[in-house]
Structure formats: structure tokens, C-alpha cells
Amino acid sequence: TEPPAYAEAYAALPILAAPYVPSREEVVALRPDLLIGWSHHFTPEALGDVYAYIDRGVGAYIVPATVRRGHPTLEETVYPFIADMGHIFGVEDRATAYTNGLKERVAAVEMRTQARGRRYTAMILQAHGNSLYSMYGPAYIIDDIARKAGADNIVDRQMRAIGPERVLGFAPDVIIYVNPKNVPPEEARVELRADPNLQHMKAVRENR
């Protein structure tokens, strides 16, 4: 759900029909000045190479946190991304203020984590339906966010389109459930608990 302060502006944007990535023809037809996307958007199977758009006079920006290289952190990817957006759109002061607010929130979380005196093992899980799952490894920014909150990823590499038997091979203290449908947190928890493949996982039984 979009923050209330931005909901009206977001609702006014034209939304293309494609659920994930529009076609190249759709993008070109919109005559954009700038494309901002994830790294996998600019592949031969999706929108094509960024330089094809630059040659057309269209700027292209790849969100740093989506470049699967190393172990991305908020400090190395998210904060610079916000700074770049501030520079591109001429709102550097607002971008700096927003980043400072995020840093304060992260610091507060890290302080609570330290005061708790305990860390948890976590699985970062996404369900695709038809008994297929993905587990996120350290190449995703969510790994750093979880670590800052006191949860250590039990998975050391990305696992895509795997069956439940692979998921059940792990026993995390908690499950961080990635739900792309943008549903409320409680609805996502209900969905996870209702998955018949995962009923025997301790984290699911204990609603964690």
C-alpha cells in the first residue's frame, strides 16, 4: 500500500497492463524521458539493453539494490539511490531529509535489536503457487534489512522455483514472507499459515 501522502499522486500515474514488465513497444509508445527499472528489466527477454534507449535519447537508470552482486546494504545501494533521485529531479534537500529519516529509523531498530540481546535465524521466502517457492539469499537487499533487525538469513544463496521439500530442509526461527500481491501483513500471514506444504515448519506453527 502506498503511503497516504503519495497515494493520490501514485493513483494518477498511467499503469500499463503488463503485471511485471511491459513490452518494448508499449514503453516506446509512451515516449518517456527516463526509464527507472530493476536490473532484470534491461535484459534481452524484457526491455532490452539500456543503451538501446540511450541511443533513442531516453535516459535509463538501474536501481542499484537490484544488481545481484556481492552483499548489498542500505548504505551502499538504497541511500545512494535516493540521493540519485534527488539529483535527477532537482529535489536534493527533500532526498537528504528522507534519507536522514530512514537512517534514524534503522538506528532505532538496531538499538532495539541490541537491547533484546538475542538474534534469530530467518528464512526469506516467496511462494509462487503450484508448490513452487523461492528463497532469497545475501545478494538481495532484504538480507541486509533483516540482519539489521536481528535476523540472520539461514540461506546462503538464492534458490528459485524449488519444491517444498527443499524449503522443509531448513528450520528457521522466523519466516520473512515476501508477498508480491501487496496485501496487508495479517492477510499475508494467513496465506502462509494456510499453505499445506509448510504446516510442519515450527515457524509456521508458532506464527513466527
Regions found by a protein language model. Give the residues of each.
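Solvent-exposed loop/turn segments at secondary-structure junctions
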Residues: P3, L34, H40-P44, T66-H71, ...
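A ligand-binding cleft/hinge motif common to bilobed small-molecule-binding domains
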Residues: H41-D55, V178-R193
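Short hydrophobic/charged patches on amphipathic alpha-helices used for structural packing
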Residues: R24-V28, D143, P164-L168
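A short, structured surface patch at a secondary-structure boundary
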Residues: T1-F42, I154
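Extracytoplasmic substrate-binding proteins
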Residues: L34, D49-G129, N207-R208
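Short, structured coil segments at secondary-structure junctions
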Residues: A11, D55-G57, A149, R205
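Alpha-helical, coiled-coil/dimerization segments enriched in small aliphatic residues
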Residues: E2-A5, Y20, Y133-G163
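Conserved acidic residues
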Residues: D33, D173-I176
